[in-house]
Amino acid sequence: MSRRGTAKEKTAKSDPIYRNRLVNMLVNRILKHGKKSLAYQIIYRAMKKIQQKTETNPLSVLRQAIRGVTPDIAVKARRVGGSTHQVPIEIGSTQGKALAIRWLLAASRKRPGRNMAFKLSSELVDAAKGSGEAIRKKEXTHRMAEANRAFAHFR
């Protein structure tokens, strides 16, 4: 057991322009090779494109997209008696948001298109409307959890 005491829980900082934690979480997930300024550029360009497309606050579109993609339940592989079962588990809010952001970025990267800002803005707008690859991923996860409800007691 550690003698130092418990570690303080870290909270995500907010970004300089929108002063929002979700935007900062998005920036940190899109980050590659430590190029944070490029990550900020991509996010802010995507936000501008969302503003032009929908003529609404891009922050509200982002919140709506993340709320739509956030899963309530997921499956976790659990080995019981020589066979592996997919056991459904509930997901907390912070873990759910992290998963949603990861799925949105993965879906954006898969999209055909010119640049990442354009692809990300399109995926966020689609997710806010209730369509898109990230929404399909969430629904597939929920279906998988529903199908394996019989194994819920293995938690």
From Swiss-Prot:
One of its GO terms (molecular function) is structural constituent of ribosome. Keywords: Chloroplast, Plastid, Ribonucleoprotein, Ribosomal protein, RNA-binding, rRNA-binding. GO terms for cellular component: chloroplast; small ribosomal subunit. It comes from the Eukaryota. The keyword Membrane does not apply. The keyword Chloroplast applies. It is found in: Plastid, Chloroplast. Its main location: plastid. One of its GO terms (biological process) is translation. InterPro entries: Ribosomal_uS7 (IPR000235), Ribosomal_uS7_bac/org-type (IPR005717), Ribosomal_uS7_CS (IPR020606), Ribosomal_uS7_dom (IPR023798), Ribosomal_uS7_dom_sf (IPR036823). Part of the 30S ribosomal subunit. One of the primary rRNA binding proteins, it binds directly to 16S rRNA where it nucleates assembly of the head domain of the 30S subunit. Belongs to the universal ribosomal protein uS7 family. This is Small ribosomal subunit protein uS7c.
